[in-house]
């Protein structure tokens, strides 16, 4: 189960495109077609999801749909319904649909991108309303879960200060504005639940060893490479422990 960029990480992992997200992040974060002021003026979105889930995904660094489809692993991608302000969960059996709409919707950051249309509904980033969907994983039948956090242990998310600006910019999407402004409460509650489940032995938690100080639109490739190497080291360090946890 993946949220926002995590859904793309999961799709690439299931398809055994193990360095795909690394290459996208490092090699294209400064590409004007992908993430730039120029894109904002030309395409109406700072992060050009149309290019990301178009030319980049189908021509430059394609997902291995055949491996994904035959993996026997089910991906769940979380997105937020713009009308209801509630999370919704999508289970793509393959990645053949043009534009990968479920992954695209899961990554659609308000303000930085446009909403994504699926079945006549508009969706935004799943992290707004279910940032750490551990409860959903259990509801889907998982008995044990591995949770990968992007913040250090002890992190507490603070409320956004520019509330009036958020409401003004997102006046077309009142429910999304509400979700943005209340996200800190949801996130902190979910963190508490994750650590409670860790104590009970229901989940294995991987958290960064240091504060990452990374923006959602980070462009410093040295910093991004450092973060990737930190995560890779954490994976190697915990690989055997995870195997034992899942078998136990």
Language-model segment annotations:
Residues 33-37, 170-171, 209-218:
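A short small-residue
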Residues 39-47, 86-91, 121-124, 178-181:
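Flexible, glycine/proline-enriched loop segments at strand-loop-helix junctions
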Residues 62-63, 130-134, 189-192:
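Glycine-rich, charged/polar anion/phosphate-binding loops
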Residues 60-74:
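A short alpha-helix-loop-beta-strand transition element characteristic
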Residues 144-202:
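Helix-centered, glycine/charged polyanion-binding patches within enzymatic domains
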